[in-house]
Amino acid sequence: MSIQKSTNSSSLAEVIDRILDKGIVIDAFARVSVVGIEILTIEARVVIASVDTWLRYAEAVGLLRDDVEENGLPERSNSSEGQPRFSI
């Protein structure tokens, strides 16, 4: 088995296109302690992908709700006109 070295260089546009096409996940965890006392903890998960890539992934693992796909989004009610509604 031999190692092949690519002599082609990639432009920034090609790298970004590849990342958006395949997606990338960066999972980071850092903890700063002094004398056993935790001062700072950082947890981060960054996902970079195109909307098309996420939709293909969500459909493959069943994250998309069937009722939204079949019936569309539900109608908005006007019970609280002028008041923004947020739900989590």
From Swiss-Prot:
Domain of life: Bacteria
Primary localization class, coarse: other
Keyword Protein transport belongs to the record: no
GO cellular component: gas vesicle shell; vesicle membrane
PROSITE patterns: GAS_VESICLE_A_1, GAS_VESICLE_A_2
Biotechnology: The minimal pNL29 gvp locus overexpressed in E.coli can be filled with Xe and used as a contrast agent for ultrasound and magnetic resonance imaging.
Phenotype of gene-disrupted mutants: Required to make gas vesicles in E.coli in the absence of GVP 1.
InterPro entries linked: Gas-vesicle_GvpA-like, Gas_vesicle_GvpA, GvpA, GvpA-like_CS
GO MF annotation, one: structural molecule activity
Annotated Pfam families: Gas_vesicle
Subcellular location(s) of the protein: Gas vesicle shell
Assigned keywords, A-Z: Gas vesicle
NCBIfam families, A to Z: PRK09371.1
Assembly description: The gas vesicle shell is 2 nm thick and consists of a single layer of this protein. It forms helical ribs nearly perpendicular to the long axis of the vesicle.
Purpose of the protein: Gas vesicles are hollow, gas filled proteinaceous nanostructures found in some microorganisms. During planktonic growth they allow positioning of the organism at a favorable depth for light or nutrient acquisition. GvpA forms the protein shell.
Family as reported in the entry's similarity comment: Belongs to the gas vesicle GvpA family.
Protein name, as recorded: Gas vesicle protein A2
Lineage of origin: Bacteria, Bacillati, Bacillota, Bacilli, Bacillales
